Amino acid sequence: MIVLKGASALSPFRLARFESRLQTTVPELRIVGAWHCYLIQIKSGHTLDMSALHRILQAESVSELPQKHVVSRYVMPRLGTHSPWSSKTTELLHGADQPIARIERGTRIDLLGWSANAATCPAIAKQLYDPMTQSLLESEDEVKTLFNVPEPRPLERIALIDLEHANTRLGLALTADEIDYLRTRYTELNRVPSDVELMMFAQANSEHCRHKIFNATWTIDDKEQPYSLFQMIKHTHQHTPQYTLSAYADNAAVIEGHPTTRYRPDPITGEYRHEAVLPGAFQIKVETHNHPTAIAPFPGASTGAGGEIRDEGATGRGGKPKAGLSGFSVSHLRIPTLPHPWETPRALNPRMASALDIMLEGPLGSAAFNNEFGRPNLLGYFRSFELSASKTLTRAYDKPIMLAGGLGAIDRIHIKKLRLQPGDVIIVLGGPAMLIGLGGGAASSVTSGTSTEALDFASVQRDNPEMQRRCQEVIDHCVALGTNNPIRSFHDVGAGGLSNAIPELLHDSEVGGVIDLAKIPSDDPSLSPLELWCNESQERYVLGISAPHLQAFAAICSRERCPFAAVGVATATEQLIVGYGVTLPAALHVTEQQTPQRANRTETSPTPNTLVSPVREAFAIDLPMDVLFGKAPKMHRNTAHPPPPQWPTLDSTQLDLHHAGLRVLAHPTVAAKNFLVTIGDRSIGGLTAREQMIGPWQLPLADCAITLAGFSSYAGEAFAIGERAPLALLNSAAAARMAVGEAITNLCAAPVESLSMVKLSANWMAAAEYPGEDALLYDAVKAIGIELCPALDISIPVGKDSLSMQSRWQGDGATHTCISPVSLVISAFTPVADARRQLTPLLHHQTNSELWLIALDGGKQRLGGSVLAQVHADSAALPAFGGECPDLDTPETLRAFFALMNDARNAGLLLAYHDRSDGGAFAALCEMAFASHLGLDITCDNRTEHLFPHLFNEELGAIVQVADEHRTAFADLVEHHGLTAYTQRIAHPTTAPSIRVMHNDQCLAQWTWETLFDAWWSVTHAIQRLRDNPECADEEREIARTFTAPGLKPTLSFDPAADVAMPFISTGIRPKVAILREQGINGHIEMALCFERAGFHSVDIHMNDLITGRVHLDEFVGLAACGGFSYGDVLGAGRGWATSILERTALRDQFAAFFTRTDRFALGVCNGCQMLSQLKSMIPGAEHWPRFVRNRSEQFEARTALLEVIQSPSIFLSGMAGSRLPVAVAHGEGYAMFDTPADQAAAHVALRYINGHGQAATHYPLNPNGSPNGITGLTTTDGRITILMPHPERTPRTINLSWCPNEWGEDAPWLRLFRNARAWVG
């Protein structure tokens, strides 16, 4: 066991912030320092090269003497767990030939002023560590216990008389009927159950997995109901089955898309190719991960995103996740530095994360998984809501909603799973088993706070998106084989772990199975059979493949370094047998064989560890499949509606318009969402056509997201969210209708062809066990399932429910309860024919125009449940939340609105579009003004007593910008669709930096543009100051609030349409370029495409191909090192990848020879840039290059920034000098750190960030990583090798850019970079 001391773990501003928080409790406490602490276990019988280990880890042996009065505390991963960092770093060190059994990293904190009071103070402990994921240890000796391995825990047999006790002890959440059912079945089997069988049954039959409430029969108010909830949802598909290819039958729904062509590497040769145009299809799925996010926000949200991504990948026989969405509903934030009068104090559940902690950590977790996996997150929502119903009852989201969804691409030949046959091999693909996420399915199905804290922790999972990336590469390879795809059927591993996934896989094909527990990959030899079978370790899939394909499948996994194990076989008898020592066919032992393909890769792809079987009892599981799936008791619910709500009605006549406007814009639900958006990559994959950010000033105000179906098409897919949950406290049916309506009004920003092509995912949340809430849920489902959606010809082919949305705890001598409203989140998806015809809230500056409001309420202007009411709630016993509830009164009105928008778009009458929602028309208008840096004169032509309902009602509707010259044509079109009574001119843009409300030429209220913007920006600013570098937060606010700021101002020194490569392409010669990737790289497809378009022949090269000698760099004229997260960036971005080259002599020599050849070129982008910068010692002319370290903001930055191309020797940038170009930025470590000032002066800088005035950007976020003089791209002395942190390969077409001048054509300027390389080769 070795302990090493690493570099400082916290930057100066984070240390100061940390110390300040400690001193609020113990003023005399000082932090001397905080360092990374590495704990290393060496493989038995091996000797470690300590100098190499010190070099790789940038660490040293601990030898200093303790300082007087200084106390050290160690914050380590929770005892008994393996951190994601450990998994990635262990693999990295194996790749560098280091004989490491395991490595963990923690933080050593040295404290001055530590006392007995501090040692026992809970507030200090809370600041030092998170008990859900970490342990606080007092000495190095305690740290070394982290690797202690306890004895394997035994299998248990449970007497039938003890089932109730086991139900509580194991957290099974079984009902009395289910316990009786189990007693009956085991009596018939003449034996007692094992603990494994009980846990498996509990997970498979949990509300989370079996959806018992949605499948229940109902009696409401003493009346039998004709439908179950699920039947009402399915009714929408029965009414409108068109355009749906798969519904309710798989991990995701599949719907029709436009014809497209796939671009991917040939699975045999690795050469990238455009495949034939085929009918399009895409899968859609939206999940929630509420309970884990309430307990541990970062890993809860991260694994929520990861689980949904796996659902898309495991659809049919293999899909490819393409773009994501996310969302959060929480209670009041109560930001200490941003108090609001409506956020009144109350008791909070001590066992759950606060709303602020959830929003500080949860979005980072969700974004981190998407970023590292390589999926753009293009859409989201955020709601903060809380309403006091009594002293002990609150309607809020203490148990949050964490939404994770998206869409993916799937080949039509792979939509349907094949049936497994007896003898087919059962595969576990992905990471090893660990004691994490145990019982999550059952835990998420009960009221939060009613289980034990230990069970809460056990249900929390941990994330490793880089492992999931490897799994996806295996799936992609199998799918590319077309009809030879070896995958017959598969499922992702989620709730219940293997205990749910493998039985589901078998049950789908009506077969049984024999599973050997000893074959299941595990990182923890102490796991009991229950823990091994039921844990929810993430990034795993279970697959069924035929035995003859096993060898080829093993070779695919080996190349991708993706662990897998053949754990069992399918059997004709529908019996599940699981245990140690079961007999399996010899052919399944492929993972133990040294085939020619594996032999060359053994050093880099070790066979996963499996448990050594001690003497165990007989089979842990031996059950007929129908015990799990056949005849469990069906639920019947007998309920009644609660009394009508008694919320008082807001008296808007007593409000001040000036202050009301500021309050509404400052409410977190309305306020700017930049803090949620810029942390997430939105350009990865190269198929983004509309992300959240719009316009030259880049504000996140888009109403929907759009992706492209292919790299050469304008057809694609659009998706949007609708959510109006607080209204359910007034009328749950109306709230559901409003959610569907809002999804449609958001989606109308895209060129939707037909309402019948729109498909919805419905995510339902409720506290179903609280009296009356289930009846309100029934009303809501009926309102859209039986009534609204069929009337609109819209179907709901997919969805999810989470029906334990309440939290209960003891405090102040009382029982406190927090219950969410009945909540519906609608995600709407549709194919679109031409993404260029999208609209955004960005107002046109050059045109005299007016803004028109199309209000679908018919003038009712109902204020019930509005943000206006919420921000005027005070300490009253019952806040004024009531009044008439907004509603979609007639579906025909929405149909007419949809038709109007389509016809107006087709006629070219619309310049801008924004839906009306939270905050009403006032908020929507302000957002359009903010996006466009324009002022507004808002007109109020009706009586002044109707002023507040007019401006702040949140009925369905939209605001459009219409040029004055098109006023008559638009009015005629409105009349044609019967909407004249619903439409009015509401504002016109001005160039003045102010927003006014006018009535009969009288100014009723006026604000400066900056005043309103400050209110709107306040939540983003406050959270960024708490979460990120506060200096950066202040700098961004100052730039964003400046009305005269120029924004993005591109200029071109060349014609992007001029193809300098064409003379060489016309020769028919296509030189080969190695599209180089390491495990965790995710930007290779779009890189290959750009080189292909420029006249090269792109070839997929994994580092394993070079290591094994399958290919050699001599075969290529160039190499492109792609972006992503090699080895998860665990030791610094790109360092693991570089280390795998530097620590292998043959590989190091091969790269050095390639770099030296003057007829070869190399391009490094993002992670590839970071990797090549670490190899500068072997790159001629690169000796002055910097290394790239953590961004100044200490946050992942996803931005569209403005770059200037500087005159340099770079062959890639020839003829582009002087151009100022928008470019996608997405990285966490882009700060260029030079060894000396002389190096900075001597380096050949090729690209730099600039501001809109053309000056080097020195302020955040115009310089998103803080590099000196905005430096972000460099080249060598001869220009053959260029590195840059931004992503030109993601925007070869103008449709890919978040914003660009209207006059730019099809080709974006960045395509010239790749064409220059082809011209240089000649």
Swiss-Prot record:
Residues 1073-1322 form the Glutamine amidotransferase type-1 domain. It is found in: Cytoplasm. ATP binds at G300, A301, S302, T303, G304, A305, G306, G307, E308, I309, R310, D311, A702, S917. SUPFAM superfamilies: Class I glutamine amidotransferase-like, FGAM synthase PurL, linker domain, PurM C-terminal domain-like, PurM N-terminal domain-like, PurS-like. It catalyses: N(2)-formyl-N(1)-(5-phospho-beta-D-ribosyl)glycinamide + L-glutamine + ATP + H2O = 2-formamido-N(1)-(5-O-phospho-beta-D-ribosyl)acetamidine + L-glutamate + ADP + phosphate + H(+). InterPro entries: Class_I_gatase-like (IPR029062), FGAR-AT_N (IPR040707), FGAR-AT_PurM_N-like (IPR055181), PurL_large (IPR010073), PurL_linker (IPR041609), PurM-like_C_dom (IPR010918), PurM-like_C_sf (IPR036676), PurM-like_N_sf (IPR036921). One of its GO terms (molecular function) is phosphoribosylformylglycinamidine synthase activity. Pathway: Purine metabolism; IMP biosynthesis via de novo pathway; 5-amino-1-(5-phospho-D-ribosyl)imidazole from N(2)-formyl-N(1)-(5-phospho-D-ribosyl)glycinamide: step 1/2. Gene3D superfamilies: 3.40.50.880, Phosphoribosylformylglycinamidine synthase, linker domain, PurM-like C-terminal domain, PurM-like, N-terminal domain. One of its GO terms (cellular component) is cytoplasm. The keyword Nucleus does not apply. It is an enzyme of class 6 (ligase). Keywords: ATP-binding, Cytoplasm, Glutamine amidotransferase, Ligase, Magnesium, Metal-binding, Nucleotide-binding, Purine biosynthesis. Its main location: cytoplasm. Mg(2+) binds at D703, E742, N746, D915. It comes from the Bacteria. In the N-terminal section; belongs to the FGAMS family. This is Phosphoribosylformylglycinamidine synthase. It comes from Xylella fastidiosa (strain Temecula1 / ATCC 700964). The lineage of its organism: Bacteria, Pseudomonadati, Pseudomonadota, Gammaproteobacteria, Lysobacterales. The gene is purL.
